[in-house]
Amino acid sequence: MKYGIVLFPSKKLQDLANSYRKRYDPSYALIPPHLTVRDPFEATEQEIEQVVSQLRQTAKESHPLVLKITKYSSFSPVNNVIYMKAEPTEELKSLSEKCYSGALSGEPEYSFVPHVTVGQKLSSDEHSDVLGQLKMQDISHEEVIDRFHLLYQLDNGSWTVYETFLLGGGE
């Protein structure tokens, strides 16, 4: 089964992201707006038990973190993804690194760039046009995230929560 690890931002930020995703992201119906902490990975039922155990420990050892969105940006020319850029805080980087160690060991496909996708799989012209419009807008959003989520992918391609982990162990 395929799994992933994400942070879900507040409803306010999700609503803003969805206002663009409805039109510019073909994955809109498959997963809510999120910040990917670890790329999707395959695991068996036995392996996922070890993963969950490790994630519980990671959550206990971590603290709630600040998510600060500062601008719209893009991964162009590598690919035509438009996103809300999150400041790469030490807490975010540390959480992502921990999610690539132990039972989750592996190498990320790309270096960690914290972001919330608002558009993808656009033609080059549409990408350029939409990004140009978004860059003219001010975006400044800050919130505290106190949990992360292990998701799994259903047969129809959509993602759902397998388990939620409170940062700081909920203490």
Swiss-Prot record:
SUPFAM superfamilies documented for this protein:
LigT-like
Any keyword Ion transport? no
Q: What class of enzyme is it?
A: hydrolase
Keyword field contains Hydrolase: yes
Q: Where is this motif: HXTX 1?
A: 34-37
Q: Which residues form the active site?
A: 34, 115
Q: What is its EC number?
A: 3.1.-.-
Q: Which domain of life is it from?
A: Bacteria
Location of the motif HXTX 2? 115-118
Keywords from the UniProt entry? Hydrolase
Q: Which residues form a coiled coil?
A: none
GO terms for MF:
hydrolase activity, acting on ester bonds
Give the UniProt family note.
Answer: Belongs to the 2H phosphoesterase superfamily. YjcG family.
Q: Which HAMAP family is this protein grouped with?
A: 2H_phosphoesterase_YjcG
Q: What PANTHER family does the entry give?
A: PHOSPHOESTERASE SAOUHSC_00951-RELATED (PTHR40037:SF1), PHOSPHOESTERASE YJCG-RELATED (PTHR40037)
User: What is the name attached to this protein's record?
Assistant: Putative phosphoesterase RBAM_011910
Q: What taxonomic lineage is listed for the species of origin?
A: Bacteria, Bacillati, Bacillota, Bacilli, Bacillales
